[in-house]
Structures are given as structure tokens and as C-alpha cells.
Amino acid sequence: LHLGGKVINVNSQESSVQKGETFNDTLKTMEAYCDGLIIRSPNNEILSDYQNNIDIKMINGGDKFEHPTQALLDLFTIRQELGTVNNLKIAIVGDLYHSRTIISLVKMLLNYNVALYFVFEEENKMDLPIYLQKYLIEIKEKSYNTNHIIEYHYEYDLDKVIPIVDVIYMTRSQKERHMPNNDNLLHKNKLIRL
């Protein structure tokens, strides 16, 4: 907005989608009004499904599995406060399994030389989703023949990690994303707290 931009906020309840217009037609209409779109949707495939149908940029403002705009702000804050992201030791703590921001932040952090410490309570089984664990392994294997250093650790005791990290990234329990009758809810009072 400081650069002269203007925002057009379109709520799905206020759009012509309610009258039967296709989402693709809505995007085509928006394309005529603006230079870019930030889309927040519970559909995690919406950008990949439609990005080739319009000639303006689309930014993921949050979907079912990721929240890259929040992760960009978090990355910006780390850099703003510490002057760099490279060579930092970063603890990522809490409900790792259900957090959308963690997935996006980890993917961004893997572009830097960082050591990541994933801290979660073992009995809660809230560690990283399997696909993110596989992604970490894949990226680490690709970096073996480069100067890109990727280091990550799993830890159950935050007290062990606090003295050695530069950043502690805390997430809350994502109880709205838990399945009903999930054992994790039984442990909500035992989640890691600072």
C-alpha cells in the first residue's frame, strides 16, 4: 500500500460463485481488475489447478496444508532481528504435525545454511508429517555435493535446546485441525510451554 497499491477484498460469500459462476470465471474477472491475487482457500490445490489459466501472479495466502505468507513474515522477522538467516540454529517447537506455518517455514529455511531442531513431546506424537520428513531427507541428499549445509534434529526436551539455539519458533496446539477423539487432545495440558 505504501507503494501505491490498492486492495480489492473478495469474500467467497459475496462473489458470483454463489450464483453459479465458476471459480475460473471469477479469476478471469479478477485478472481484469488487478496485477496479482493473494488467495486464501481450504483447497490446497487451487493455485496449481488455476495458475496456468490466468496471466497475473497468484500468491498462496494459506491453504489446507501450508501458510507461505505467514512463513515469509516469520522469515522476514528473523532476518530483521538477527541480520541474517544463514548459519542460525532454529528450534521449531509445538504441534509440528498440524501446523501449516511450520511446513512453509521449513521449506523456506532449507534455502539457507541452518540447523533445525524440531521439538515436540514424544508421547503426543506431534512430530513432522511424513511427507515433510521425506522432503527433508531428499533436500539433504541433494545438498551433499554443494556448500549448502542442512542439519536437522528431533528433540523431546526443550530445555536441552534453549541454550544452543538462536531462534525459538513456537506454535500453538492446532486443536481445530485435530481429529475428534484424537489422543493428542488428551495431552493438550502437557504440550511444551516456555
What are these model-predicted stretches?
Residues 172-193:
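Glycine/threonine-rich flexible loop motifs
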Residues 56, 113-114, 194:
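A short helix->loop->beta-strand "cap" motif at the edges of active sites that frequently abuts
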Residues 20, 75, 147-155, 189-191:
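Short gly/ser/thr-rich secondary-structure transition/capping motifs
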Residues 1-79:
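Phosphate/diphosphate ligand-binding glycine-rich loop within oxidoreductases
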Residues 1, 80-171:
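Glycine-rich phosphate/diphosphate-binding loop of Rossmann-like nucleotide-binding domains
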Residues 49-52, 103-106, 180-183:
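Short amphipathic alpha-helical segments
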Residues 41, 171-172:
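Glycine-rich, N-terminal phosphate-binding loop of Rossmann-like dinucleotide-binding domains
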